[in-house]
Amino acid sequence: MAPPTKRTRVEMAESSNKRMKPSETVPEDVLELMMSTYLPVQSLLTTRVLSKRFRETEVRSLDLDFSGIYSRRRRKVEVVGIIEKVFNQHKGSEIHRFVLLLNHIGVEDKIISWTNTCFDKNIKELVLDFSKSRKVMAIPIDFSAVESLQVLKLRWCKFEIPDSSPKGLKLLKTLSLMRTQVMVKTIDAIFNNCIHLESLELIECRMDGILSIRAQNHKKFKSLVVSFMPDLRHIRLDAPTLENYKYDGYVICVNILITNALKEANLYYTRIRRLYHQKSDLVDTLRFYTRLTVLATTTIFLEALTKRYVGEGRLENPPFKFENLTEFKISFITPTFCTLFDIAEFLKECPKLKQVVIDIQNFTFEPQMYFWEIHHKAQIQNTSNNNYLLKCLTDVKIIGYKGHWHELDIVEFFVKNAPSLKRLELQMPKNAKNDAHTPDVARIKLIKTIFSGVKVTEV
């Protein structure tokens, strides 16, 4: 087929330009209605300022997102005035989304008025973030009467819900609470009322003792996030449909009654005052994670899997295999005794593993590692028995690579033991010149003769 001539290309461009003028084909009243309804409110306000044609356009926006209203460093009184004006001028019958990031002190009455207007207009998504005030707002919202809401995110805002509400939050799919008091009756009320709940986030909330989730009758509950709730001592989950579990905090007791659906877990364990915890606290929970396909965790998790004395001078690993795991990320935290040996011992129990990420951006190995040198190095580097063969592994990434000799041990391990390896990326921090080690040119050359696809990037 012959390429188009210059004249043909010009005609095509002219035809395209004609099609790109919607105002010539769409009636002006329809265009104005579409803009006033479907443009996010801040885009609509900007259009009204910049365009004379749309200066008198009514406010019917379904999306009232004011999260970026501080971008021009407006004063609080100006921000409140803009929002108040929008609500006073809003002519639409519905508001689907209201996002507010504001210091609430002194304007509580206006916030209550705005939210009540949203409830009257069948709000579907409500996000209230009062973190700017650094003080929890006790907003008197009666959620027992809110039926249309599907997404609710509250930051630094008190949350209450009656235990047996006939309508309240029956359609809610996503609930995210941050920096608020959560009690046992609150959790019970959530799962008694929100029968369509899919996702629950509890971030920096205050709750003592036990977090018990009874979702055995829920068919859609798939995701749970529990982040930094230091007063918790135990988590008990009866959630047969749970697929994704994220926990960030100290090692505590966990009991998951049914794990058939659980596929992904992010277990970012931290230490209490930089002390070591009892290994048994974590070992007792490992059985709940053996069916995972995706796991992200810290070195505290690996420490629980290291060999222990079982009597008569014998050392044994806890008997856990992760036969479905395909993606694994390990973040090194200080202090830790973990080395390549601990990584390799875990990986050999993951026969389907395809991707590995090792994050050492906030960690540096010691200059001398005598235990590794004396007890583990020879075992790891012995390739005659292929104990550490990773047949399915294709992708490896090391975040925070600084050229330390033990980092090269890790790189060499993967290029020698992963016959299907396709990508090996070493991400170096741009500001790590003071931490970077003198390159071991000879060793790097040896590694590249085994696998030439090593890629070094700066991030």
Swiss-Prot record:
<feature type="domain" description="FBD">
    <location>
        <begin position="396"/>
        <end position="428"/>
    </location>
</feature>
<dbReference type="InterPro" id="IPR032675">
    <property type="entry name" value="LRR_dom_sf"/>
</dbReference>
<dbReference type="InterPro" id="IPR055357">
    <property type="entry name" value="LRR_At1g61320_AtMIF1"/>
</dbReference>
<dbReference type="InterPro" id="IPR053772">
    <property type="entry name" value="At1g61320/At1g61330-like"/>
</dbReference>
<feature type="region of interest" description="Disordered">
    <location>
        <begin position="1"/>
        <end position="25"/>
    </location>
</feature>
<protein>
    <recommendedName>
        <fullName>FBD-associated F-box protein At1g61320</fullName>
    </recommendedName>
</protein>
<feature type="domain" description="F-box">
    <location>
        <begin position="21"/>
        <end position="69"/>
    </location>
</feature>
<dbReference type="Pfam" id="PF23622">
    <property type="entry name" value="LRR_At1g61320_AtMIF1"/>
</dbReference>
